[in-house]
């Protein structure tokens, strides 16, 4: 190769029009004619976005660009035509541009690459050199003789043979054997040598160790060692000289018995398997071929399968979760996760107690178990469990058949709950407690009583609010009275309790008697220490009625009975009506005297038992001090105490006399218990008897009550005095007496009920006749005002009330007016107020004290013998 080498080859050359004509021109013309023939195969549609695909001017149809030919849906083949046609060893890489084929180089691509080069323009170096040659296109090595390996780097070790070019294994020449073909074979011409073992293998028709014996098997081979004939197909016998009669099978080589092929049976294997069977000896059953079609007798294949079956032999059910023809349907979900039937799609099985295509239906009543195949036993008052068949009892019964009632103390389902009743007598079904007849009545009565109490409380609250708003006596008060009223809050609170009692309905107590009343002054600053009248004993003489406004529910009691409060008017500075002047009373006498005399022991001033609610309420609400009364239950005293009181002898009553019935016309409308007293009347208290009186009980035999304790406290304290004021002109004597201020409190501790002891040590003592006359004047004034009130009420309409029985009246002789202590004028603003003419003030309804009652006849007789009631 002169001046030509692989490195000096030009890249590519362009054929010009003036080049020499190609020697391959006739062949190219033939190819062009073939290309111009109509194509019998429809060309593939071009991809508008493919390589070298263009659009013709004025058309939207894609076509290959100039110089390119279609290859698939693109234009990937370059075309070199005309003067640009490539030679035999050239390839067209671009339109009108040729390049040398791999393995060739030169100006005309007519020079083959040297052994050590390959590829385009012989630019790639061959790695097999010098023991092999590279392929021009791929560069794969082809080793020379006696060389092997990927790069022909290994030498072949076979002595009488060749090596495999990749593995190097030896291929021995005939007559040689061994790993490297180094051993020679010693076999006759009727045999060949085994290259691995070197043993001689006899040719067909020869047998023996040296393969020198010929077989006598009628052209059939024989065993190499024994020479026994190995008959060919369809022959049998010792020499393979008999013809086999089997139609679809093989004959036994000795006796010629037929061994039928699968799908046939019979002596000569002429009978195919019956429908539904296939295989060797027709022993296997066909699968679920559709429509009872027979399967192939040899393999058992079916043309189509029944619904729910799959496989070539239709012997495999549908996979889990599928069913139907061709196993193309998906099973709907079954209850409890069970699979569906591969043929019908229904659930294969259900849990005990459920049936249906989807196991969605419970067993009907009376059956239970799997597929509801079992019948329930009799469950009495219960029902059968649809799963287990066990009787489920209703509340109140138990047992295997639900026919046993719950024992006492238990209830509910299966009697599993304990009763919460006191005596375990509850309903076995609901557990409600059974009440006996008396218990039911008690519960009903308690409910009714509760309703009545609620109604009563609501009524009391309503009445209190209504009466407080309608009280005509409430009016604006001066600032000083308001300040004094704050100090007397306990007394007003006591009065409000009495107002509640006045709103209660009147309850007739026809078989009770009025109690005895003992009046004693209490300190104005005393704490809340009042109660109401004690209900008379039911064993005494019946009375027409007793005002329910005298409550028996609260306040203090003493050894002699309960204590109730009677408010009196305020002092001049504390008076509710500032327009009415008041006259202070003189200081009490130095020596106490009894309130009654033997001459007045036969009569007693009657005291009414009822009172007007509004007047009594207004009087109790006053800020002034209160008169307290004790209801003394008289006990049997010695004859000496019974016969004389305060040193005065009284003749005992010969017999107990029943008092005559009261006159309804003279019954007052206002009770002295709640009536408003004037300051003067309340202030003139009788003097107590001397300490040595036999009628006074011993101090050691008498308990100290809260009222006595308060009285004792005031007694040892500093004495309080009031400035006496003169009676204003024009004011009647009775009004003056009623308006007089209240004297200091008197205590009766240790001197018997009704005996008053002055606590004011500063003033002169008052005589007994003087005190008696003042008390009589007060009572006469109250009686007159009561009469005027009755006349006024009679004009409006009489109120019929049952009159209480009257006791024998004991009168107190009036004291001489000359003995009344003179009133001294008090200078100050009060005097200027009294100089003015006093306006006419409304008369207060002053009740009269009701005579007390005794519990027994002996007590009544003792009262008659004792004389007048102790005030």
Curated annotation (Swiss-Prot):
One cellular component (GO) term of this entry: focal adhesion
Record topology, Cytoplasmic segments: 463-871
Modified residues (Phosphoserine): 551, 613, 651, 653, 710, 718, 742
UniProt feature, compositional bias: Basic and acidic residues: 570-579, 632-643, 705-725
Signal peptide: 1-43
GO biological process: heterophilic cell-cell adhesion via plasma membrane cell adhesion molecules
Superkingdom, taxonomy of origin: Eukaryota
Keywords: Cell adhesion, Disease variant, Disulfide bond, EGF-like domain, Glycoprotein, Membrane, Phosphoprotein, Receptor, Repeat, Signal, Transmembrane, Transmembrane helix
UniProt domain EGF-like: residue ranges: 71-110, 122-153, 148-182, 183-212, 213-241, 236-270, 372-403
Transmembrane segments: 442-462
Carbohydrate-modified residues: 83, 310, 365, 403
Topology versus the membrane: Single-pass type I membrane protein
InterPro entries noted in UniProt: EGF-like_dom, Growth_fac_rcpt_cys_sf, LE_dom, MEGF10/SREC1/2-like
Tissue and organ expression note: Predominantly expressed in endothelial cells. Expressed in heart, placenta, lung, kidney, spleen, small intestine and ovary.
Disulfide bonds: 75-86, 80-98, 100-109, 126-134, 128-141, 143-152, 156-163, 158-170, 172-181, 185-193, 187-200, 202-211, 215-222, 217-229, 231-240, 244-251, 246-258, 260-269, 376-384, 379-391, 393-402
Extracellular side, ranges: 44-441
Function according to Swiss-Prot or TrEMBL: Probable adhesion protein, which mediates homophilic and heterophilic interactions. In contrast to SCARF1, it poorly mediates the binding and degradation of acetylated low density lipoprotein (Ac-LDL).
Disease / disorder: Van den Ende-Gupta syndrome: A syndrome characterized by craniofacial and skeletal abnormalities that include blepharophimosis, a flat and wide nasal bridge, narrow and beaked nose, hypoplastic maxilla with or without cleft palate and everted lower lip, prominent ears, down-slanting eyes, arachnodactyly, and camptodactyly. Patients present congenital joint contractures that improve without intervention, and normal growth and development. Intelligence is normal. Rarely, enlarged cerebella can be present. Some patients experience respiratory problems due to laryngeal abnormalities.
PANTHER family: SCAVENGER RECEPTOR CLASS F, SCAVENGER RECEPTOR CLASS F MEMBER 2
Protein name per Swiss-Prot or TrEMBL: Scavenger receptor class F member 2
Source organism of the structure: Homo sapiens
Top-level taxonomy: Eukaryota, Metazoa, Chordata, Craniata, Vertebrata
Encoding gene, per UniProt annotation: SCARF2
């Amino acid at each position: 190769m002169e001046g030509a080498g692989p490195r000096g080859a030009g890249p590519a050359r362009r054929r010009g029009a003036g080049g020499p004509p190609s020697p391959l021109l006739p062949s190219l013309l033939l190819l062009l004619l073939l290309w111009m023939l109509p194509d019998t195969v429809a060309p593939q549609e071009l991809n508008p976005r493919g390589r070298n695909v263009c659009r013709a001017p004025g058309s939207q149809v894609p076509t290959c660009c100039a110089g390119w030919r279609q290859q698939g849906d693109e234009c990937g083949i370059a075309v070199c035509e005309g003067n640009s046609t490539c030679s035999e060893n050239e390839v067209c890489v671009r339109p009108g541009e040729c390049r040398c084929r791999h393995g060739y180089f030169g100006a005309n691509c007519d020079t083959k690459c040297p052994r050590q080069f390959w590829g385009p323009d012989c630019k790639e170096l061959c790695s097999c050199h010098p023991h092999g040659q590279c392929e021009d296109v791929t560069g794969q090595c082809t080793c020379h003789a006696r060389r092997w390996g990927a790069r022909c780097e290994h030498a072949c070790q076979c002595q009488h043979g060749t090596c495999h070019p990749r593995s190097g294994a030896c291929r021995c020449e005939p007559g040689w054997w061994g790993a490297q073909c180094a051993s020679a074979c010693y076999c006759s011409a009727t045999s060949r040598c085994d290259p691995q073992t070197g043993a001689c293998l006899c040719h067909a028709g020869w047998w023996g160790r040296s393969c020198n014996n010929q077989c006598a098997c009628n052209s059939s081979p024989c065993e190499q060692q024994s020479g026994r004939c190995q008959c060919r197909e369809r022959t049998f016998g010792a020499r393979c000289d008999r013809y086999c009669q089997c139609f679809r099978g093989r004959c036994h080589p000795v006796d010629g018995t037929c061994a039928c092929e699968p799908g046939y049976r019979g002596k000569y294997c002429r009978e195919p398997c019956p429908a539904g069977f296939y295989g060797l000896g027709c022993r296997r059953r066909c699968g679920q071929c559709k429509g009872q079609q027979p399967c192939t007798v040899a393999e058992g294949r079916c043309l189509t399968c029944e619904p729910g079956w799959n496989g070539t032999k239709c012997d495999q059910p549908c996979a889990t979760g599928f069913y139907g023809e061709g196993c193309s349907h998906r099973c709907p979900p079954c209850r409890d996760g069970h699979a569906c039937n591969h043929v019908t799609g229904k659930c294969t099985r259900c849990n005990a107690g459920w049936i249906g295509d989807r196991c969605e239906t419970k067993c009907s009543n009376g059956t239970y178990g799997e597929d509801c195949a079992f019948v329930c036993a009799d469950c009495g008052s219960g029902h059968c469990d649809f799963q287990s068949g066990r009787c489920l009892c209703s509340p109140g019964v138990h047992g295997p058949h639900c026919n046993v009632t719950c024992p006492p103390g238990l209830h509910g389902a299966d009697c599993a709950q304990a009763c919460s009743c006191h005596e375990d007598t509850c309903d076995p079904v609901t557990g409600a407690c059974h009440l006996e007849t008396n218990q039911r009545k008690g519960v009903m009565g308690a409910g009714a009583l509760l309703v009545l109490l609620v109604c009563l409380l609501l009524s009391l609250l309503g009445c209190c609010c209504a009466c407080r708003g309608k009280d005509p006596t409430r009016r604006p008060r001066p600032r000083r009275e308001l300040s004094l009223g704050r100090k007397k809050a306990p007394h007003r609170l006591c009065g409000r309790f009495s107002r509640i009692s006045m709103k209660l309905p009147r309850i007739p107590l026809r078989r009770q008697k009025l109690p005895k009343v003992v009046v004693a002054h209490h300190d104005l600053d005393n704490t809340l220490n009042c109660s109401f009248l004690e209900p008379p004993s039911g064993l005494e003489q019946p009375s027409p009625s007793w005002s329910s406004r005298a409550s028996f529910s609260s306040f203090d009691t003493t050894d002699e009975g309960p204590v109730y409060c009677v408010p009196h008017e305020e002092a001049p500075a504390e008076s509710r009506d500032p327009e009415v002047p008041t006259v202070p009373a003189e200081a009490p006498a130095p020596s106490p005297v009894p309130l009654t005399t033997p001459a007045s022991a036969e009569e007693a001033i009657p005291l009414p038992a009822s009172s007007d609610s509004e007047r009594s309420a207004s009087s109790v609400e006053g800020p002034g001090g209160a008169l307290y009364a004790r209801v003394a239950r008289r006990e049997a005293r010695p004859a000496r105490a019974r016969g004389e009181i305060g040193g005065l002898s009284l003749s005992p009553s010969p017999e107990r006399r029943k008092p005559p019935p009261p006159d309804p016309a003279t019954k007052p409308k206002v009770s002295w218990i709640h009536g408003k007293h004037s300051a003067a009347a309340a202030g003139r208290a009788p003097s107590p008897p001397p300490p040595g009186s036999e009628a006074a009980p011993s101090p050691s035999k008498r308990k100290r009550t809260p009222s006595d304790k308060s009285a004792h406290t005031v007694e040892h304290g500093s004495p309080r005095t009031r400035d006496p004021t003169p009676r204003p002109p024009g004011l009647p004597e009775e009004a003056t007496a009623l308006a007089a201020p209240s004297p200091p409190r008197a205590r009766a501790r240790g001197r018997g009920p009704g005996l008053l002891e002055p606590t004011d040590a500063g003033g002169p003592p008052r005589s007994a006749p003087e005190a008696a006359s003042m008390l009589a004047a007060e009572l006469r004034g109250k009686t007159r005002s009561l009469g005027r009130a009755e006349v006024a009420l009679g004009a409006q309409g009489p109120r019929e009330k049952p009159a209480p029985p009257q006791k024998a009246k004991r009168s107190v002789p009036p004291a001489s007016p000359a003995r009344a202590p003179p009133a001294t004028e008090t200078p100050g603003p009060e005097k200027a107020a009294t100089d003015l003419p006093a306006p006419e003030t409304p008369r207060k309804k002053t009740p009269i004290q009701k005579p007390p009652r005794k519990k027994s006849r002996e007590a009544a007789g003792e009262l008659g013998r004792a004389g007048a009631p102790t005030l």
